[in-house]
Amino acid sequence: MDVDAEEKRHRTRSKGVRVPVEPAIQELFSCPTPGCDGSGHVSGKYARHRSVYGCPLAKKRKTQDKQPQEPAPKRKPFAVKADSSSVDECYESDGTEDMDDKEEDDDEEFSEDNDEQGDDDDEDEVDREDEEEIEEEDDEDDEDDDDGDDVEEEEDDDDEEEEEEEEEEENEDHQMSCTRIMQDPEKDDNNNDEYDNYDELVAKSLLNLGKIAEDAAYRARTESEMNSNTSNSLEDDSDKNENLGRKSELSLDLDSDVVRETVDSLKLLAQGHGVVLSENISDRSYAEGMSQQDSRNMNYVMLGKPMNNGLMEKMVEESDEEVCLSSLECLRNQCFDLARKLSETNPQDRSQPPNMSVRQHVRQEDDFPGRTPDRSYSDMMNLMRLEEQLSPRSRTFSSCAKEDGCHERDDDTTSVNSDRSEEVFDMTKGNLTLLEKAIALETERAKAMREKMAMDAGRRDNLRSYEDQSPRQLAGEDRKSKSSDSHVKKPYYDPSRTEKRESKCPTPGCDGTGHVTGLYPHHRSLSGCPHKDRVPPEILAMHENVLKCPTPGCTGRGHVNSNRNSHRSLSGCPIAAAEKLAKAQEKHQSCDVSKSNQASDRVLRPMCFVKQLEIPQYGYRNNVPTTTPRSNLAKELEKYSKTSFEYNSYDNHTYGKRAIAPKVQTRDISPKGYDDAKRYCKNASPSSSTTSSYAPSSSSNLSCGGGSSASSTCSKSSFDYTHDMEAAHMAATAILNLSTRCREMPQNLSTKPQDLCTARNPDMEVDENGTLDLSMNKQRPRDSCCPVLTPLEPMSPQQQAVMSSRCFQLSEGDCWDLPVDYTKMKPRRVDEEDPKEITPEDLDPFQEALEERRYPGEVTIPSPKPKYPQCKESKKDLITLSGCPLADKSIRSMLATSSQELKCPTPGCDGSGHITGNYASHRSLSGCPRAKKSGIRIAQSKEDKEDQEPIRCPVPGCDGQGHITGKYASHRSASGCPLAAKRQKDGYLNGSQFSWKSVKTEGMSCPTPGCDGSGHVSGSFLTHRSLSGCPRATSAMKKAKLSGEQMLTIKQRASNGIENDEEIKQLDEEIKELNESNSQMEADMIKLRTQVTITTMESNLKTIEEENKVIEQQNESLLHELANLSQSLIHSLANIQLPHMDPINEQNFDAYVTTLTEMYTNQDRYQSPENKALLENIKQAVRGIQV
């Protein structure tokens, strides 16, 4: 039987390649799964798939319905010949049991046989069967030629090609093949006649259909085991023996649409000759097919071969691959079942099927004595096996008892069968051929799928082998429980590969190509699918709920490595990163204080302010800055955000030891600043430090500007942070606690520098009375202290008011240990009176706290640039809010007055293609691919959101060429301007100050601490001047979730500061002038356009006039010609007198012509001789007129 299987497998493959599919069977190539629209097929880029093998819906349903089961060993035939009675008993018992019972019987019945059989016999028999394959194909070719089947004639050519490939193997067992051929002549004599009988043709074609499905399943099984590199192989001589073993571990989908459609087609075929099949044919077909196979296994006992136990172990891993072949298995069984039904009906009308059975048994009994276990059979055994199935007597009677009667019936049956018409024969043969072709193509496609999945499985197994050696154990450790199976290639849908299931795009109709995020043929989410617009709303809603960041409170914005609207992991979540850094900060609370002193002072540097150019300050010599490159910014921030600070244990009413920040070198500027250097905030406690989350570079509550000011001079400089309650509240809403700086506020004002403490120990504390605390770790209770806040806990306005109300003095050495925020510098009056202390009860958190220490001439919003040169790093006006760039970005963006999204300001830009990042939207024109090269964009200013501002380089005389940082025609800052760099270099060489822009530019800095001015929504300058469009302020405000009243207060403070700042007012006036200039330019453009329109209209009018003149000339010429013709006609007809009319003249010319026209039109009325003569005269007179 293996020869039959091998030959049919070769021929099936050739059919799939060579036989064209006719349009009539194209409908077979759509997915049969109910509810499947053809999308998500794992095997390729087709809009529709043709089977349930690669259908994701069918795969999912089978996985859910499939119950885990123990691997069942294959059914093994006995190695001894069984008599007819045992065959009958086996059939009857198996036919009455269900699938599960048969699996158990197989386990018990053949377990010993499997242990006793050897591996060597399997290998030898498989080799001999493969070598004898070509000889047997020749026998089939003879039979096919007699049948006259065109399709099988094409298959003969394929068999000849394969015969050349196996010519050497064929010669080794040539003698054995010849012996087999000598023993089969009577079978050939009985079956080489043409199939004139209709039912015999149906039986033959149905056998081919069943064999095609059976061979496809067998080939998948054989190739899978050959890839496992084991010394064991399946038996090739009986495919149905193998199918029995496989069915014990397959969960067959008898309700599959493939099976259902095929059975429907066969039912229609059966109805053509009066056979009615039951509706549950699909349910019965499997059990009957199993029982029939059991019967054949018992009859053909010489065909059996031992089975290896190693294969049974591997069947567990390969069972999933065979699940996809269950439909073909069912198809084969149903074909046999249909053939049997045909045979049960036909004996009533014709005696052919019983006769076939009789001939079968005669030949069978004759052939059995001469067979050996390694005997192979030609394709004629296919018909014999089918005849055995068709005959019910072969299952109920002994073949020996029926032998004589069968001989007597041969001739009669043949004569009856020859009466079938040739036309019905050809039609049926064509229909069955189409079905065979369709199944052949499906089998070939399934084979290609399995080969591809086997290659993928091999690569994954190689990766898994490395993981097995690593100490980290994966969740699926059961995949490597068997060491002998570590090298076996697992199928793509192996149950252990749970992470690979459903790895396809859920978009209907998407084949996996064009996914924006990866290099994989299939994508597993909707986020990057190019066909996302096809997704139904319910599916989209489901995925939107699933594919979200697991961080609580995260909306998906700001993910560091994704351009999706939502991120699905913590790896790139800014909030998760902030919490992680906060936890890391808490681990270092027990570190030594000296570690903080050893930290680099670069923590205080304005790392985010990478574009700011050094600006000379009122005649003082510039200090060359050391800027931090943007490329190293993230690393340095991460490095310095891990600075350790020491805390002692404390409670809500005690103070711990104050952490010391790295020193900042400053320079004495004025006596006023010197005097003010005495005052610091009283609340130098960990509780206040932990709340300054986003002010690592600021020593005060001033984490963000807006109605605040400060002065910073030298080591004896002073800092006034009284008016920064607004900033303190924003700092309290921070996520991180990357800074443990002290918030210090002035309390006692003095004009004498001697009031400073004489001790310089930076670790000493000073109480409100000016007494030094010489104890390093001493804790003092403070009744007025606010409760301790955690790093992630927002501080209430009342708490911040209390913190900023109590002040005390620190030693002179502490001046060097405080980080200075140079964005809030302002002059202080020496003779100001001391501020009063406030309590949370009589304090409006924003209003009074911000106004309490406002003095005459004081500005509530800081000067964007310091009015005095403070230190050698004064050119770095802006300082980062924290060491985390993500935290800075988030906290600042929340403080904007408007809630607009941080999107690119370029009109029509959706945020894609931005040069500088992976974000869903970009916030500036610097990397926008759609930014206009002309340098004009819409700017949203405070006064008029529709005003336009140029985005040109601010350096005077620069035309935008040669900018080092961009590819655009105009640049917006002097950081990369070659002209500015050249002038600055010349200024240094000549000793003169370099000013690339007027001093008014100094005021154009954002009041948000740490903001470098980039990404401002409403400005086109390097720095922005208010909180209204600051992305960092917007982000912080969103996180703080401030109420409307608080937001209004902040906006009022910001607006008040802008109104009171003369430089800002000057800038606003200039902006108004620019707006007026722009308006004038727009008016000029409108005028110009109007002039152009008028000119165009005038030219059109002239053209129309010229055309009219031409028309008039033509009309005049036509009138002249008409007058000439009239005169000629009058002259010619002057001598002709019409009845009842005067001679022709100019007065009666029209009437005369009308009469003539009527006469010639109605000549029937003028048939008299006189009228005819008149008409003839008129013709002669008019003949001489030239038109």
Curated annotation (Swiss-Prot):
It holds the Pfam family zf-C2HC. Residues 362-377, 401-412, 450-504 have a biased composition (Basic and acidic residues). Residues 89-172 have a biased composition (Acidic residues). Zn(2+) 5 binds at C953, C958, H971, C977. Zn(2+) 2 binds at C505, C510, H523, C529. Zn(2+) 6 binds at C1006, C1011, H1024, C1030. One of its GO terms (molecular function) is DNA-binding transcription factor activity, RNA polymerase II-specific. This is Myelin transcription factor 1-like protein.
